[in-house]
Amino acid sequence: RQDGIPGSLHYWYNDSHEFRDYQVKIVKDFKRVIDYLETRSDIDSRKLAYYGFSWGGILGNLIPAVEKRIKIAIINAGGLKMYKGKPKPEVDYINYVSRVTIPTLMLHGRYDANVSYDNAAKPMFDLIGTQEKDKKLIVYETDHIIPHKELIKESLDWLDLYFGPVGR
């Protein structure tokens, strides 16, 4: 993005109005994308999935909680908190994560130094409001980057499980 927002607002919670406004802007932008996808005859808007990697995975606490047109979430190297101060309640992910109730697959590296497994990913997984049978956490003996073959296989299997195989 070339929006003039300092890089620190992209990754770290803080209690500023700027951080709050940026989070609201991200959600509005995401909703506009879905509005557009719904106008396309070549897109089945009943089968929209959220995929987030790293900071996009962290946004998986918020976007699937407030955008009900998303039916599945795949979170890669995401987690619940990366604090530098306490965010305003209206954008504190702890207030949203339990509202994520769609089937959710999380993939995470046990040795991720960017988004801690123990302090961010596991707490997010435990607090997601999705029924146990519809959420899955796979932990790899890696760092922030999941091996691509496993990532692709698990993601496609998850999409096929809930959306069915892609028609040919």
Per-segment meaning from a language model:
Residues 1-28, 84-86:
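Cap/lid segment of the alpha/beta-hydrolase catalytic domain
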Residues 28-96:
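Primarily recognizes the serine-hydrolase "nucleophile elbow" in alpha/beta-hydrolase
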Residues 74, 105-107, 138:
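Conserved hydrophobic packing residues within short motifs/helices of P-loop NTPase cores
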Residues 94, 117-122, 153:
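Short, surface-exposed alpha-helical segments at coil->helix boundaries
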Residues 97-101, 127-131:
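Short, conserved loop/helix-junction motifs that constitute active-site signature segments
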Residues 100, 106-108, 112:
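Short beta-strand/loop motif that positions the catalytic acidic residue
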Residues 113-120, 147:
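Conserved alpha/beta-hydrolase "acid-adjacent" motif
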Residues 130-168:
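C-terminal catalytic histidine-bearing segment of alpha/beta-hydrolase fold enzymes
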